[in-house]
Amino acid sequence: MKISVAIPTSSLQDESLKIDKTRKISVLARACAIFKIDTIYVYNEGNNGSDGSFMTMILRYLETPQFLRRRLFQKVNDLKFAGVLHPLRIPSHNTPTNAKKIIAGDIREGVIVTVKGKKFVDVGINQLIQFYGKTPTGKRVTIQFKEGYPRLSVKEIDNSESKTYWGYDVKERSNLFSLLSEWKGNIIITSRKGKIVTKEHLEKYTKSEENLLVVFGSPEKGVHEIIGGRMNKVQNSKSLNFFPNQATETVRLEEALLGTLAIINAQK
């Protein structure tokens, strides 16, 4: 079972400064990496569309290994405060730069470059490796070494072939209802209006082979308010309250994400 999350663009509206928005997204990314989230869906909610593209860029930037960022991201204003971001330190990021330590079977992230008409892959070892895969120049790719040092030949693979958590995808959605109505799998809607979560509730999902989508509302609207009367058209969903008897008026997204995923993870 793979777990994905859906979070609203409006979750940044509580922060007025871009540096604070950047820090908040960093916490969200860390929470998703800790609990091995497969895909982060950023759905549009509210009127500030620029927050959506900003959130998406920072989430993708954080998930990208540090040694590839210079090739994949231009210097733009949205990355002005990248220095405050906390690194994810997931397995795809923790790779040695010494080519002599590479052995057959190692998996890495790289970016495709073209030199004199030939394609190479840069995997952060201060030398380019010839590449014969289909990924176009300028794009990120997952490779596996067929031969270690000194021959260093590689093949293109799907990142799902890694035996360890390799990172999350980030996808934008224009609205939440389209995501929920098209989702193939189980859905948990986090809500104060839901049933208080129990071990029995969660085991139905954690023991299932179906993928799970965990949905979070906005600072001003819960998921039921966002969806409105179309809620009954959402299949395989259940509303659960992960914070019963909360003392605070609201639970911020970063708090809800960490708390909810920790509870789900404990039942896996």
PLM features per residue range, with description:
Residues 1-268:
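Post-transcriptional modification and biogenesis factors for structured RNAs
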